[in-house]
Amino acid sequence: IGGSFAGLSAALQLARARRTVCVIDAGAPRNRFADASHGFFGQDGKNPQTMIAEARAQLLRYPTVRMLEGAATSAAAVAGGFEVGLSNGLTLDAARLVLAFGISDVLPEIPGLAGRWGKSVLHCPYCHGFEFSGRRLGVLQTMPMSAHQALLIADWGSTTLFLDGSDVPDS
């Protein structure tokens, strides 16, 4: 379950091991708002959607692979493996199940933030920090670890932690 980088990587290794593979993809990868992906040799700076399309094309050359568009809405252990329910009402049976659906970002309700997400409002300095090096950076406190994030991104530029009124951990 998951048709972005992690799910496609798992599917490739399974296909090369001659396993039957069905990749279920809801079509909403975490990096869908970013224009470029970084940190992959041979792919650095490439559009994530282009990378996914190329990976899918490579995978579909293996005769044991199929891609299924849709969202998995349930998964349950059954005799002999798993039963996966899909949003279109179909049910699939599988001997093994790889959960590679990643993370969903929950954005604070701040006017204008969603439109900048993945472009100038970012979640990961390792993914996007280099392109913003030397600029003034900010971290919006949304959880206790936000102070740690502000200390972390200070390596990329002058950083301000914007507090939301909740406590900042001493450590």
Could you tell me what each predicted segment is?
Residues 1-23, 30, 123-169:
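Rossmann-like dinucleotide/flavin-binding elements
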Residues 66-135:
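FAD-binding core/adjacent interface of flavoenzyme oxidoreductases
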Residues 2-7, 39-42, 48, 102, ...:
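Glycine-centered flexibility sites
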Residues 21, 33, 108-110:
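Short, function-defining helix-loop hinge/capping sites that tune catalysis or transport
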Residues 5-22, 48-55, 61-62, 100-101, ...:
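N-terminal FAD cofactor-binding segment of flavoenzymes
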Residues 14-15, 36-39, 111-115, 152-155:
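Short, glycine/charged-enriched secondary-structure capping and boundary segments
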Residues 32-91, 167-171:
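N-terminal Rossmann-like dinucleotide/flavin-binding domain of flavoprotein oxidoreductases
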Residues 25-28, 63:
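Structural signal for hydrophobic packing residues in well-ordered secondary-structure cores
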